[in-house]
Design a protein with these regions (language model features):
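Solvent-exposed loop/turn segments at secondary-structure junctions
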Residues: 80, 112-117, 153-157, 201-203, ...
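Catalytic-loop region of hydrolases
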Residues: 27-102
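Secretory targeting and sorting signals
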Residues: 1-29
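Loop/turn elements at helix/coil->beta-strand transitions in domains of secreted/extracellular proteins
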Residues: 103-106, 142-148, 191-194, 220-224
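Short, surface-exposed "cap/lid" segments of acyl-processing enzymes
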Residues: 80-144, 151
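Accessory cap/linker subdomain of secreted extracellular hydrolases
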Residues: 45, 228-307
Length: 307
């Protein structure tokens, strides 16, 4: 029977391999410091009352290389345990008119693995042409779809990123759809239909949004969901990847679980020896492009208590 450490490592391999195998554009992404807050990403304290999906603030931003109107948005959402949080994202509306039937549809895009540092937030990377999800955004805009890309909980905004938590990610997707419906002054068509899209971590997010929509956001006009390679069958990856180039990414999974459920943080971290706890601390500062230098080729036996 797999140990808790082995199960955590299994999850880590899935989230690490998918975006890199998918052909990510590693264009000089920022690394290191996780102190990537600026004024936009600091939510009101206390968070004002309201409903999930309410827009807390929005501002126009530059969309490099895109023929689109871009709006950065902060919106209200819920974490894995139902607590109110603020999440950020970006909404893109193409300049070209919609040639299909009815109002222009909106695709809510769940990004693949980004990392854990606040500087890894997709809305920050997209501003500098360092976001590999442009590989999906560009063709969607070319077809006339509006695209809304979430940063997820804890990327850019204060607090940890609950990596691979389907509830948090599903809520972030659904609440961005709600927020987008309020941006008719920024090009979103009234009566827009909603679709979900994502690969890897984003595939999990797209599937989670589709699964949760009926109970969490039944009012949304959801018509489709595309979920590519969501983390699912993990055993083979665990066997093949223990001690691989990307093995240090287990820190993202452990830190993500602790961010979603802080009451188990001490127990989780107790499974790691001092070297392992150092890996966890540094993992909170890394983006996905840093993965090859996150203790590559370290077998889990080197940094866990039980091996």
């Amino acid at each position: 029977m797999p140990t808790p450490t082995a199960r955590l490592f299994t999850a880590a391999l899935t989230m690490l391999l998918a975006p890199l195998v998918a052909g990510s554009v590693a264009a000089a992404a920022p690394t290191g410091s996780a102190s990537g807050h600026d004024a936009f990403y600091l939510p009101p304290d206390p968070l004002p009352g309201g409903a999930s999906g309410d827009v807390l603030r929005a501002e126009p931003v530059v969309a490099p290389a895109l023929d689109a109107l871009a709006t950065r948005v902060m919106y209200r959402s819920e974490n894995a345990t139902g607590g109110p949080i603020a999440v950020t994202g970006t909404v893109f509306v193409p300049s070209r008119p919609w040639a299909g039937d009815g109002p222009r549809p909106t695709v809510v895009l769940g990004p693949g693995t980004q990392g854990m540092g606040d500087q890894c937030a997709p809305s920050k990377l997209a501003n500098h042409l360092q976001e590999y999800e442009y590989l999906h955004i560009v063709p969607l805009l070319a077809r006339g779809y509006a695209v809304a890309m979430t940063d997820y909980e804890g990327l850019g905004t204060p607090g940890g990123h609950p990596y691979l938590n389907r509830v948090s990610q599903g809520h972030a997707m659904l609440d961005l759809a709600r927020a987008a419906l309020q941006l008719t002054d920024r090009g979103i068509d009234e009566g827009t239909r909603i679709g979900f899209w994502g690969y890897s971590q984003g595939g999990m997010s797209s599937a989670a949004a589709a699964e949760l929509a009926g109970t969490y956001a039944p009012e949304l006009p959801v018509v489709a969901a595309v979920a590519g390679s969501p983390p699912a069958s993990l055993a083979d990856l665990a066997v093949a990847g223990d001690g691989s180039l990307l093995s240090g990414g287990i820190g993202w999974v452990v830190n993500g679980f602790a961010a979603a459920y802080p009451q188990v943080r001490e127990e989780l971290f107790g499974a790691f020896n001092p070297a392992g706890r150092d890996i966890l601390a540094r993992a909170e500062t890394f983006c996905v492009y840093d993965a090859p230098r996150m203790n590559p080729f370290f077998p889990t036996a080197w940094y866990t208590v039980d091996g």
